[in-house]
């Protein structure tokens, strides 16, 4: 028994074709929106590519760009099909290809749904990408004289100012790396020598942070050096006092920013997916309604349209059987090929 069987007369078929034509062209605009969202996200990721490990971070924007282009192509073609469906002579040339086209549309809808899910689920991958990239970026902060890295200080400083953050996980991350270049250290100073000798790696480590970690909203002038030395500052206790630094790490700040972007894009993609599914269902009804016209010479006669020719369970069984037959035919062909090669070898 057919699923969701609906009766159509000529007037209903025309209205369905016209409605689908309009929906397809609206979906072309939706495809442009998807393409634009993917392009925007790609640009935003490129802006911070210096503090990212780019091995996986561009999967989502590339996917959005791809499905946006495919949406424009498929829906433009579907709009043409719906327009030609009003003319039996023009519709005849599309008739042999409609089943294949509908199968492609179903596959595209599955891909679109998976892309929408990726927008929500790739937070973990993005977090590891940011953690690795920021850690390396902070290591190169001091290399202002090294070709290829001289821009890193400005990049990190602008990042911390823009996103109101400090370090990777927090301001204490700066205590673990040498972020002051040797060029600006006085190696004749006893303090510098003692600090370098105080650790195995021979690095100049200080309990201080770059100026870009300072919070301008703080009423107190920024304390960025000797943060853990209470006696170095008047009326100061680093354990109880609210420091005049950004306390949030840049990984969390960037992760929240990109996650909110991708969540919004995921919602938009899901809405477009629902729209695409309704178009595919409408095309199926139009296709079956035109196929079941009993008298093609009488355009006014009634016909029936349906979503599935059989029930869901029967359709699934038929699909599995056809899949098994396809596998068996491939196996038979392979055995025949092996049998043909055996006499040649003999």
UniProtKB/Swiss-Prot annotation:
Gene Ontology terms: biological process: cell adhesion; detection of light stimulus involved in visual perception; photoreceptor cell outer segment organization; protein heterooligomerization; protein homooligomerization; protein localization to plasma membrane; protein maturation; response to low light intensity stimulus
Cellular compartments annotated: Membrane; Cell projection, Cilium, Photoreceptor outer segment; Photoreceptor inner segment
Residue ranges, annotated region (Interaction with MREG): 341-346
Membrane-side (Cytoplasmic) residue stretches: 1-24, 81-99, 291-346
CC per GO annotation: photoreceptor inner segment; photoreceptor outer segment; plasma membrane
Main location: membrane
Residue numbers on the Lumenal membrane side: 44-61, 124-264
Signal peptide residues on this chain, from the entry's feature table: none
CDD domains the UniProt entry points to: peripherin_like_LEL
Regions that span the bilayer: 25-43, 62-80, 100-123, 265-290
Subunit structure: Homodimer; disulfide-linked. Forms a homotetramer. Forms a heterotetramer with ROM1. Homotetramer and heterotetramer core complexes go on to form higher order complexes by formation of intermolecular disulfide bonds. Interacts with MREG. Interacts with STX3. Interacts with SNAP25.
Annotated family: Belongs to the PRPH2/ROM1 family.
Role noted for this protein: Essential for retina photoreceptor outer segment disk morphogenesis, may also play a role with ROM1 in the maintenance of outer segment disk structure. Required for the maintenance of retinal outer nuclear layer thickness. Required for the correct development and organization of the photoreceptor inner segment.
Protein known as: Peripherin-2
Lineage, uppermost ranks: Eukaryota, Metazoa, Chordata, Craniata, Vertebrata
